[in-house]
Design a protein with these regions (language model features):
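Extracytoplasmic catalytic/substrate-binding loops of multi-pass membrane glycan-assembly enzymes
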Residues: 32-47, 55-67, 365-368
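Membrane-interface alpha helices of multi-pass inner-membrane proteins
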Residues: 116-117, 152-169, 175-180
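Hydrophobic/aromatic-rich transmembrane helices and adjacent perimembrane loops
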Residues: 46, 50, 126-128, 132, ...
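Membrane-embedded, lumen/periplasm-facing catalytic core of multi-pass transferases
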Residues: 46-50, 349-441
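Aromatic- and kink-enriched transmembrane "portal" helix at the membrane-lumen/periplasm boundary
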Residues: 30, 62-65, 79-93, 109-132, ...
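Signature aromatic-anchored transmembrane alpha helix within multi-pass, membrane-resident enzymes
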Residues: 19, 108, 152-155, 159, ...
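Transmembrane-helix signature of polytopic, lipid-linked glycan biosynthesis machinery
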Residues: 28-36, 114-121, 163-165, 206-210, ...
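Membrane-lumen/periplasm interface segments of specific transmembrane helices
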Residues: 190-274
Length: 443
């Protein structure tokens, strides 16, 4: 066993340095991106925040858009509000973990991993759900240690599950993880608390579906539920690639064009998972650690099987973030037991790789934002409802729409080519013939 110990004062300095660098990297991650780390889904979140209380879709819950909306009351626009949500999510995790003495060192390193830096800098709901996942695991520990009565524990855990479902529908998976963990421990006093709260969460989703989703979108089931979307061979390949990048502590994005570099990226992820498996088997897991690992694995398994009937993006580090964070927590706790303070080097190494990647592929969001703002003002479109033509959402033209959405989020896609003849429909060509947008060197 190679254990490296530091004096508390020196370890504290290392922790402070790691946190400061992580904050800086989160900010640089979106400022040095040509469009500020947004995606087509980000447009939907910011647009929903902009037009609320009007509901224009139920593809995602209202939790994240409403959080963005809240900070717009402090003179921030929707883009900057979303970035503040990410920074606050990171801050809440640190403060909560420190005050409760709950995996504090582990969560500090996890948050410094480049994949999680990318999450906190992304205008996506995963950033907001992460603090509640940590709180959920903490509540599980308290219940296992019998700190709560059946009623109190069930109430707190049910409330946390309901909050997560209101941020991401995949929060429902934690309900099933709850029930399975409870059934696996049916001889212990706390099993009823986990089972009951899981059932409450599922019942809440059922009520939510019939009273909210169906009310605003009667065709939700017809639109998103479709059996046989992808063959098993493709899903298994995507699962392997997604898991290998999710559990790569340094690089979470593979080269879509393939190449030898992907062998290294996937290889590191596979080795990390094998090391996790070895440590989890070799060292005895506590009941709390079992709860965290089992719940996380159930969510990952359900994320795979849901793809057979539900239209969703391929498994990747972002979709897996709420489910991988728990496994990372237990893994880093085991690494601290074996290597001590040397474990901090993983966080610093990941930040270094992340900075190199960010710098080599850097764009200039602030400059591009200035150009887009000028364009929208000149065209009197700053506060108008916009339409933007793209062939499909995989088209590179989408990036121009994403950039526009950071200034005016009230934008919709149109896929009808004839719409490009209309004056009120924007295209990439119409925008870029009037302004210059600086692109990332590496897409």
């Amino acid at each position: 066993m190679i254990t490296f110990k530091l004096k508390p004062a020196k370890e504290k300095y290392i922790q402070i340095l790691l946190v400061i660098i992580t904050y800086i990297m989160i900010i640089l991650r979106f400022l040095l991106n040509e469009k500020g780390r947004v995606s087509p889904d980000s447009i939907r979140y910011m647009r929903q925040s902009e037009i609320f209380p009007v509901i224009d879709n139920t593809t995602a819950p209202l939790g994240y858009p409403l959080a963005i909306k809240f900070f717009t009351f402090f003179e921030l626009d929707h883009f900057w509000s979303s970035k503040l949500v990410g920074l606050l999510a990171y801050t809440v995790i640190l403060i909560f973990a420190y005050r409760k003495q709950f995996f504090f060192k582990e969560l500090m390193i996890i948050s410094s991993l480049f994949s999680f830096v990318s999450i906190f800098s992304f205008t996506m709901s995963e950033e907001m759900i992460l603090p509640f996942v940590v709180i959920y695991f903490y509540l599980g520990r308290q219940i296992i240690n019998q700190k709560y009565t059946l009623a109190k524990g069930s109430f707190y855990l049910s409330l946390c599950l309901i909050v997560m479902i209101n941020i991401r529908y995949s929060g429902l998976f934690f309900c099933f993880g709850n029930i399975i963990f409870g059934l696996m421990n049916f001889r212990k006093n706390y099993w009823k608390t986990f089972g009951l709260s899981g059932i409450v969460g599922i019942l809440f989703y059922g009520i939510y579906k019939f009273t909210f989703i169906d009310y605003f979108n009667e065709k939700y089931i017809d639109t998103f539920l479709e059996i046989g979307l992808k063959p098993t061979s493709q899903l298994l390949l995507e699962l392997f690639q997604g898991m290998a990048t999710t559990f790569n502590p340094f690089i979470h994005i593979a080269d879509p064009n393939g190449g030898i570099i992907n062998y290294g990226i996937y290889g590191i992820g596979v080795l990390t998972m094998l090391l996790m498996l070895f440590l989890f088997i070799k060292t005895k897991l506590s009941d709390t650690e079992k709860f965290i690992v089992i719940g996380s694995l159930v969510c990952i398994v359900l994320s795979y099987f849901i793809q057979y009937i539900y239209s969703v993006n391929a498994i990747d580090y972002r979709l897996m973030a709420p489910f991988s964070i728990g496994i990372w927590m237990v893994f880093f706790r085991k690494l601290f037991t074996v290597f001590g303070a040397l474990t901090y080097t993983i966080g610093f190494a990941s930040l270094s790789v992340g900075f190199l990647f960010t710098w080599l592929s850097k764009g200039n969001y602030l400059e591009n934002r200035k150009a887009i703002t000028t364009f929208l003002k000149d065209e009197n479109l700053m506060h108008s409802k916009l339409k933007f033509y793209v062939k499909d959402l995989e088209d590179n033209d989408v990036q121009t729409a994403e950039l526009i959405s950071t200034v005016n989020p009230h934008i919709y896609y149109t896929f009808t080519a004839s719409d490009t003849l209309k004056n009120d429909v924007l295209t990439r060509y119409k925008v870029e013939k009037k302004i210059s947008i600086k692109k990332n060197k590496y897409q």
